[in-house]
Each structure stands twice: as C-alpha cells, then as structure tokens.
C-alpha cells in the first residue's frame, strides 16, 4: 500500500469554490487536484493500491482532512475541474472527528495533519518526508512487501514545527531530485520507483 499525505496551507475549507479560479480564489486547490490526478490515474485505469490525504488549513474552518481511497473511487475524471467538483462536494459536508463519505471513495473529517501521520506510524508503516535537502533516493532500499507513507508540502511547504515533528517520530527525509519539484510530479516519481519493485 502506498499513501500520500500533503499539507495544503491555504486551500479553502468550505464548499464555496470558484471552479473558474482554482489557483487564486480557492487557495491553490489546483495543486491538490493535480496531486489527486498523479496519485491515482493511469492511462486506462486507477491505482487501487493507493490512498491520498490532503489536510486543508485555509479559511474559514481549518483543518479539514480529505481522504481518497483508490480501490473505492468511482466516476472521478482526471481533469482538475472534475476533481475539484468532488472536493467541493466533500467540503459541503459538516466535518467531524469521524470520516464521512461524500461520494464513493472520498471522505472528509476534522483530523489534523500530525494525527494522520501518527496513526500511520502507529500502524507500523514506513514514513518518508519528501524534501529537496533529504538523502538521495538511491541511498534507500524499498521492499515490495512494505507499506509506505510519503509526506509532501504544497508550494509553501509544511513549516518548521511540522518538520521538527517528523524528525521526532523518525520519518526518513528523502530527496527525489537535486531540483525543486512540484508535489504532483513527486508523486509520479514515487509511483514509478515503486512500480519497478513488482
């Protein structure tokens, strides 16, 4: 199982989304939509072995955590507008500590970024923090019988406090490239590496 968790610092936390201006009025919701696309969409199928989380910290009601479960997703198209519509529907639900399903395979809750990561850590999953200044990918060994969790930041990053938190819990800091990459491109690169283990 592959899981991705991204912290979205400015993305709105209600359903008032302007589908014509995802980057501006919705706090870079376009970036999250592209990450969903990269996490799941193949040429003629979906990745069923993947779960994607985005924890939104924009106004007016942060945090809102969104969960996309690959083996449950239905009717989602790969374009940003379609994905944004499904996110809009999820954000229109009243979020609580319990995960609530808005459409097949898409859930929302009031879980915090750190709480989701701690849950994965307690489940015994291997936690990686994708960062430009991490150790080169070539220095890590991946086994196809392991469960992996990859932490990403948006265009702002995750912030110093959350970086310290990841260090405290023993997350492995990994770099995919000597260049700074978009989060959605990082997801594709991770998939490519792990696909080769099969």
Curated annotation (Swiss-Prot):
Top EC class, one word: transferase
Keywords noted in UniProt: Cytoplasm, Methyltransferase, S-adenosyl-L-methionine, Transferase, tRNA processing
Catalytic reactions of this protein: pseudouridine(54) in tRNA + S-adenosyl-L-methionine = N(1)-methylpseudouridine(54) in tRNA + S-adenosyl-L-homocysteine + H(+)
Entry's localization field: Cytoplasm
GO molecular function, one term: tRNA methyltransferase activity
InterPro entries named in the record: Alpha/beta_knot_MTases (IPR029028), TrmY (IPR007158), tRNA_m1G_MTases_N (IPR029026)
EC number of this enzyme: 2.1.1.257
Domain of life of the native organism: Archaea
UniProt feature coiled coil, ranges: none
Pfam families for this protein: Methyltrn_RNA_2
One GO CC term on file: cytoplasm
Annotated S-adenosyl-L-methionine binding sites: 130, 153, 176-181, 186
Disulphide connectivity of cysteines: none
GO terms for biological process, alphabetical: tRNA methylation
Protein family: Belongs to the methyltransferase superfamily. TrmY family.
Quaternary context: Homodimer.
Protein role: Specifically catalyzes the N1-methylation of pseudouridine at position 54 (Psi54) in tRNAs.
Name of the protein described by the UniProt record: tRNA (pseudouridine(54)-N(1))-methyltransferase
Organism: Methanococcus maripaludis (strain C5 / ATCC BAA-1333)
